[in-house]
Amino acid sequence: MSRELMVQDSGDTIGNTPLVLLRNISKGLDARIAVKVEYLNPSCSVKDRIAKSMVDEAEKAGTIVPGKTVLVEGTSGNLGIALAHIGKIRGYKVILVMPATMSVERRAMLRAYGAEVILSDPAEGHPGVIKKVEMLVDKLPNAHCLDQFSNPANPAAHYRTTGPEIWRQTEGKVDIVCFGVGSSGTVTGVGRYLREQNPNIEIYPVEPYESSVLSGLPRGPHKIQGIGAGIVPGNVDRSLFTEILRIKSDDAMQMARRLADEEAILGGISSGANVVAAVELASRPENKGKLIVTTVNSFAERYFTTELYSDVLNEVSQLTFSSDDEAMGIAKKYLGL
């Protein structure tokens, strides 16, 4: 929906996010990199698109009913927040199960939207989350799981919205896309749409180096919240893939900080992973002159208690009020005077 018009509720503002060139990070590279700033969706992540799509389709099918159905979902955080947001608008009780390693900010946002949060043992990984979700759905009255990992309404959201937006915003000149794989909705939905427009477009899924399940390697611990669930999602369409890119957690975090410092774009860790992948692709000689598009998936504010911004949080937590002389000293130090 157009953001130029007044809307009925905040759910109507989902989508039509801007596409921004990375002018500084791409300096010295022979390809251009642009990012869809998905944290400008109402609950501040790309997952707003699929939460609305899955709820819409389930309502049309009569599978869920506002005011009656309890939505129970496993999440690393962003889908849960998006589902809590749309649930609040539509009148659903929402229960989210997430690993205990996910950030405190995510838990707080879920509670702020009125959802219930249940933590699972991180050692059990995604299977542990699913086991808890299945137990709750089985034993709670009127409970239903939308299951983002295998729900076709997930990639369909990106096929209907994100893909066409990228095609329109680049005037059909996009050559390459790369997206982190959590539930696989973005890479599958966008990939399908763009391949229909141009069969030569290259599509690169991105996964954590430390947990490269898509690549056929064992599941392992990593720091890139939101991708690398340790399973191959049902929504994966390998026929679309040009090549799977494996990105290290530390590289993803460093790039997320660079995005803030060099581009004034505050994305999370998976956003950093996407841009690391885009830079890797832009560095390849065969991609000279090409346009590479990826996403900034979520806003950095929900990562301040994680390793990504813990140094900043610790620093500002220790600030105290200053005298005029101290204030001048702080200002001069900041300005290098």
UniProtKB/Swiss-Prot annotation:
Q: Which GO BP terms, alphabetically? A: cysteine biosynthetic process from serine
Q: Which residues bind pyridoxal 5'-phosphate?
A: N78, G182, S183, S184, G185, T186, S270
Quote the EC number: 2.5.1.47
Lineage, top-rank taxon, reads Eukaryota
The cofactors required by this protein are:
pyridoxal 5'-phosphate
Family according to the record: Belongs to the cysteine synthase/cystathionine beta-synthase family.
For this entry, the protein name equals Cysteine synthase 3
